[in-house]
Amino acid sequence: MKTSTTPSGSSEGTSLASEILRRFRLLQMDHTWTESLYATLQFPHRSQRSSLSLVDSTGLISEQISLNPSDFCPYSATGSATGGVVYANYGRPEDFNWLKSAGVSVVGCVVVMRVGGGVSFAEKVWLAEKSGASGALIYPDPADLPQDPRRLGLNAHTAVSEHVHLGSGDPFTPGFPSFNHTQFPSIQSSGLPLIPALPISATVAAKLLSQLSGPSCPSSWRSRLPYVRCVVGPEFSSGRRVKMSVHNVMTPVLLNNIFSSLEGRDEPDQYIILGAQRDSLGPGAVKSGVGTAILLELARTFSAMVKNGFSPRRSLLFVSWDGGDFGNVGATEWLEGYLSMLHLKAVAYFSLDQAVMGDDVLSAYSSPLLVDLLDAAIRQVEHPRHAGQTIFSQAEREGGSWRIMKPLYLNSGAYSFTAFAGVPAMELRFTEERAYPFVNTPLDTTSRLQEVLGGRLGVTGRSLGELVGEMVLRLAHDHILPLRIDSYAQAVLQFSAQLNKHSAELQSRGLSPQWVFSARGDYSRAAETLQRAIDNSDLHDPTTARFYNTRIMRVEYYFLSQYVSVVETPFRHVIHGRGDHTLSALAEHLALLTSDPERFDEKRFRRQLAFFTWTLQGAANALTGDVWSIHNTYTFTH
């Protein structure tokens, strides 16, 4: 594992890339190569530092607050913001809603938010901006990240850095690749923030929040900062205000993605992809080191198996990605470059990013198409902490193995593969109840990770590698791809139940939910019919197997909405994506019928319902296969 900082574009990063390439070549796989591209990344200005200060009523600086110049939020807006301070807990939608209901305005204020709460830095800053804030400060609270240095905690003077682009890839080429010689149109991602953002330490946060006056916050918002009463602001008791200035610069950087592959015997044009982020702004033991080590070990293992006689039906592709700390830039740009063909070629993607943060609880952030594959694997692999017990048996003791499966999230290395490209993807991670506090800090070192794990880093990494290896082996070997093609019917069924509750109200507005029910039924029947056909076929006949696998591989892709622009709305997946076309947006809009009927927009809802249903019906039609087998009646209004 690497031991030093390896940011993209640095000499250290280039040296590490050369070492990974050398390791791949030593394995003598069928193909090893590098793909390079220029992308626009953001770094702190070399001579002009970002700053934070307290100013008096005339705007003069009364106190300069010390910051670490290497702490920054990539893709923050540059410039200054001055105003009162509002404490917004984790910066979740419900937190900003509470402030609004309490009569606390964040307009023109600098919002202070805690790391965590299931919300990325990018989402926090976006929500603060949407609420009218002029700036954002994000800090690690001792309630969320342990800060007792005697128990492997985060130093109270250490900030956590993370990018704030609400998206992935190069934000100046949204939806299309940054490959060399591309003629860039003058466009940028709508996910770039318009307000400055800075990471601050718990010590700095305590200095600001301890001086606030204003309404008390809810008990659930209480932090563990010393000498801080839980009030939300926006006024300082001294009458002062805060001024923040961000001086980052956009820089074109050469990124290098490194590939190595083993060709399949029967279907070499279908491949299973394994990838890990290589770069990191800090030492990155968890962020990139562990994943890269597991990637190399899996490549070595499968290469040795092939040399010893194993012949995979499908190809295996091992990838070391660059630009991960800036929003999975290298991986996303590669996806954008091959978008038109990936759903025809890529069977599944496994992300090894942040694979080991503990050794107790396994989480699988995944497309539901891979659930059966995971279920079989956890029954085979021993738990890293509980010798003699499989991961499955231990999970059953602790409340059920179903808890392992979790939805994909925006900052995941797997997210873009599914939400943008329509490829089933999974990111696996071992954690423990006490959060690993050092991710995205200069303290994320191998020695600290080993100490947190009690010296079991090797054992835990091996367990995770075996899990991925078991799943990849089945995908590479089985005649029929073991993907659960009916998995999305359950998600739509839950929404159908919500629609049914509002059926009378919808029909009074001239909207019929029957079309969604019909499309869901068609999809379920198509999946069942395809499964029966597979069960009754001779799967050893290569033509038959190929015919069915081609349809199975495209199921995820069918859930990408064809009715939104990939440039304006890159995450087109109607279940996992982001935007007005998604099932979650439709459900939130539907909920307004009960919570706030005046905000329900009938015209917008009609459009959302039609687009979602057309996507679902299209997936059903594609699974059915032949046009003479499809019988549709399209009616969604009276």
What are these regions (language model features)?
Residues K2-E12, D71-S76, Y87, V112-V125, ...:
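Second-shell loop/turn segments in exported
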Residues L67-W98, P174-V286, R300, A304-N308:
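Soluble metallo-hydrolase cores and metallopeptidase-like ectodomains found primarily
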